[in-house]
Swiss-Prot record:
HAMAP family recorded: Nitrate_reduct_NapA
Keywords associated with the record: 4Fe-4S, Electron transport, Iron, Iron-sulfur, Metal-binding, Molybdenum, Nitrate assimilation, Oxidoreductase, Periplasm, Signal, Transport
EC id: 1.9.6.1
All copies of domain 4Fe-4S Mo/W bis-MGD-type, residue ranges: 38-93
Name assigned to this protein: Periplasmic nitrate reductase
Residue numbers binding Mo-bis(molybdopterin guanine dinucleotide): 81, 143, 168, 172, 208-212, 236-238, 255-257, 340, 344, 450, 475-477, 647-656, 729, 746
Record comment: activity regulation: Activated by potassium and sodium ions and inhibited by magnesium and calcium ions.
Cross-referenced Gene3D superfamilies: 2.40.40.20, 3.40.50.740, ADC-like domains, Dimethylsulfoxide Reductase, domain 2
GO molecular function list: 4 iron, 4 sulfur cluster binding; electron transfer activity; iron ion binding; molybdenum ion binding; molybdopterin cofactor binding; nitrate reductase (cytochrome) activity
Domain of life: Bacteria
Entries under InterPro entries matching the protein: Asp_de-COase-like_dom_sf, CT_Nitrate-R-NapA-like, MoPterin_dinucl-bd_dom, Mopterin_OxRdtase, Mopterin_OxRdtase_4Fe-4S_dom, Periplasm_NO3_reductase_lsu, Prok_molybdopt-oxidoreductase, TAT_signal
Family: Belongs to the prokaryotic molybdopterin-containing oxidoreductase family. NasA/NapA/NarB subfamily.
Amino acid sequence: MSTSRRDFLKYFAMSAAVAAASGAGFGSLALAADNRPEKWVKGVCRYCGTGCGVLVGVKDGKAVAIQGDPNNHNAGLLCLKGSLLIPVLNSKERVTQPLVRRHKGGKLEPVSWDEALDLMASRFRSSIDMYGPNSVAWYGSGQCLTEESYVANKIFKGGFGTNNVDGNPRLCMASAVGGYVTSFGKDEPMGTYADIDQATCFFIIGSNTSEAHPVLFRRIARRKQVEPGVKIIVADPRRTNTSRIADMHVAFRPGTDLAFMHSMAWVIINEELDNPRFWQRYVNFMDAEGKPSDFEGYKAFLENYRPEKVAEICRVPVEQIYGAARAFAESAATMSLWCMGINQRVQGVFANNLIHNLHLITGQICRPGATSFSLTGQPNACGGVRDGGALSHLLPAGRAIPNAKHRAEMEKLWGLPEGRIAPEPGYHTVALFEALGRGDVKCMIICETNPAHTLPNLNKVHKAMSHPESFIVCIEAFPDAVTLEYADLVLPPAFWCERDGVYGCGERRYSLTEKAVDPPGQCRPTVNTLVEFARRAGVDPQLVNFRNAEDVWNEWRMVSKGTTYDFWGMTRERLRKESGLIWPCPSEDHPGTSLRYVRGQDPCVPADHPDRFFFYGKPDGRAVIWMRPAKGAAEEPDAEYPLYLTSMRVIDHWHTATMTGKVPELQKANPIAFVEINEEDAARTGIKHGDSVIVETRRDAMELPARVSDVCRPGLIAVPFFDPKKLVNKLFLDATDPVSREPEYKICAARVRKA
């Protein structure tokens, strides 16, 4: 029997309601006696950045069941994808032995581990010797374990001497990092998921929480159900399922959200809803050029964003601007939540700053339920990459490449000679693949990510990956990943709970995934692979003197010690016993930190500090309200391409479907990509629901089935990117935010016609 998406979503909604009412999660159903696990092994869900705790049921050495961990923050709940992880783990579609392509255009064929590692080491070593260390690169992932990203970062920055270390968090979270750092001086949210249970107003902007973070959405919905007076404002050009529980849905014109938030600030100040007691003591003001200003300067700046003017720009009712501002400011505790709709923009950092501005001008921050909280898309983008410094401009624990003091600290911690870490940042993601296409980067390791599917302007990327001098190594579990078409060497990793390691989720919580089952075939833990590769490539053996992932974790704890990321107290033994700990956690008896920057709660704030709040990432302890200009997108619609095109998520799939595509229930529910079209736009072009249409941009054209509905606002079309047969990222431009270098997936110009 075929399953329609509508039926599937009905089933999901019904199941979610039952699960929420009963306290049970997906996957906690009764099991047949002959399939009952002999043991349950603790871990973390392999999908989004919510970081739900799971228990994997094992019998006869095989994973047979999964359920939510009742002791973790998700309280035993899992989303549908998480509840169906076991078929992914047990899939027969796995890379189980090393594969080599002996010449460009040839086929991948089996090779021994010894030959594979020797080939890999010799190619990297010879490239470094002939062309210098910047001819090699690592492209990692927010799906790698913390220990894997740490070892790779150490090998490349400390061993090879190149900062060409980047990864897919550049595509999703770099603007959030830039926003936190420029506003507060340090990355990562100050609150936790527990704030959801205390908030009385939710400002959700650029996030389809219901489909991208379903467990958190259920928690928000439950909060509204328990206390109906809680206000939910959803600002999104699409009328998503998230918006359907909102008290107010602001469907602004794409790219005008910065003006909308400035206008909210205008209302707050002009109606005296701001909190002078807070901002006078804890905030500095900076103008558009980054020069010091003051409250009066900010107030004058906002005169350009009066609600009546901005309502016309955004094409929303002016009452929504006033209503959203009042609800935000007058609430006892307001929590903002955002994701890719804010981050994946050429104004992504500025947009993040403006959310923080609203919290700072109202004092809606650093209290239970009052926080600005960026949602994360991958299970370890925060812990392994952001905290671990595995991007081209970063070093571990909040250190930065351009900072000489930080470089010296890491050289000492890693036992390196002075000056070993290069002072210039390496290539960010888009520039890295451009360098590959020019032949400047010769050798690259791509680990647990699928850039030949996910990067923008893919035709350009595919050409770069086909460079005749390139040598691309993929550490990849699934053979249908598009990137393997461009790989010269493929190494099979142990996947998820086939090895042990730590994931760090969006609320600063680090949780241990324990090994539950053995990997198939010749698959190996990636930590072991990287250590052996480094030794064969001539890296000092003492630099990678790790026997296992626990050795790596203990070194990483030491590197964090004494920093504002301090998690020295998170021993492996504690992580085995507890269901996650939230940093800072500087000692083994420390419970973890729910509220950062608060005296008496954050161990990084001195106990005798005279102020209640101390934003210690800034020299004077004050956060910053920025007067960021509300600029447009890199590519706006015009007469030739009159529509906005944006990317979107579907609840059934995650990223490039290399995992969800292995689950029949998920694949049947949404087997192919499509384009969402508003009813007005469809009527104007003669397109009906189900018609085959051509979506075209300045980069490429693609044939897709049309879904005609009221989800997109008029003038906007949307496509999901999960389908490997429809690589829709060929359509998007690769313009990047000038601060974060995150690409603009959310806005470009397009046109559509019947095929």
